[in-house]
Amino acid sequence: MRESIEIKEFTRIFCKDDVQDEGLTTVSRALFEDLEQFLFDFNSSNIHSDASEFMSLGSQRYVGKYISVNNFVGVIQTPKGHQVQILPKIDLGRDENDADEVNSFTQTKKIFLKMIRTLRDIPIKHLDTTNLKTEKLPIFEIFISMYLQEAMILAKRGLKSAYQEHEDNLRFYKGKLMVSEHIRQNIAHKERFYMRYDEYDLNRPENRLIKSTLLKLMSLSMNEQNQKEIRQILTFFELVEPSSNYEKDFSLVKKDRTVKDYEMILQWSKVFLFNQSFSTFTGKSQSWALRFPMETVFESYVAQELRKVCSDTSWTITVQDREKWLFDYPNNKFRLKPDIVIRKEDGSQIILDTKWKSLTDNERMNYGISQSDMYQMYAYSKKYTRTGGDSPDVWLLYPVNSEMRKYTDDRIIEFISKNADENDVHVRLFFVDLKEIGQSMQTLKSRLENNYS
């Protein structure tokens, strides 16, 4: 029987047979051994990748082996079809310790779905999740449900037909006679004609691709309701053949008003059929992993929400700014790309860089801030300083956690580098509350308005 579990990033997974501590996250021996096989498959199939970047095998004293989920959010399917859903470790507020585990996962899932909607290349921005029972569905099943929601809307509106070219050996004359093939096949069959002809039917590339996606999702989904809905939707595609060549059919997709209703679902189909955003594995194994780059997700979410609260200002907000280079000679080298640059009417600038990392309240350990990140902020400050002007304010934005929540009030962590030219470098930290993102961005806006200089 295939298993499905839901955990949060940085969780250690133990084999249930090896531990007695109920406070640990445990799975069956079958699933644990399958996860070990997954790690082996990944390292064998991806010679340029290291599975330890997102999962690793370790041992805890007096307990035994564990598999650690590192900085990784998404879905894993193991060689035997088990699924592990990994959600981001999001601080849900002061009451998180009082909340039950199910409620914690439900809230985290809702926040995560809001976050990934802001990604440019993920085709889910306009899909409605209000009717989905997300508290009962693993994250991957939610994506499948969203696809099925779009497919059902399309099917009920009516699938589009189109003229399709066919070749067949017929008993009647229809279309154009293919002379050479007719001679080759019908020397002994004078009653037949090998014809090329057009027919107006549903078997167009767009419908073939959707049917192929539905069939693939049927094999992947472990949810009874999703399976039921797939079977229902497939009844609309009875006269449609599955695609035998995905790339060819996508190249034949029409780009006109007649298929406007297909745009969103075909983007989804491409993700599932080509495993876009998936890390796939070769060989006999059926392993795959859907991995979300949380640095990118966090940056995208913060940028969108900051734009919303700053819409009443005259500020210009640029994401992934590409204006400056670290070296000007020869011919501009090493482009700088701060996550967010704010330019005010008076010419002053603010640099914001997002980091998906959980800091600790330990000044002696620099709060866990990476030294390379600080070098990067120093370079931003120097290169974005206006000629004859002041250095820009530089902010590092981290997700808040229970340890650093006290810094969401008026307390600021600040680093200052004194310079002879009096253009000191100021780097300040801000902790983003993902549960209360609107309020958090309002607080950030107030701090940016005050300049803190």
Tell what function each PLM region has.
Residues 2-282, 287-288:
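Residue(s) in the substrate-gating loop at a strand-loop-helix junction
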Residues 1-46, 286-453:
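Catalytic core segments in nucleotide and nucleic-acid processing enzymes
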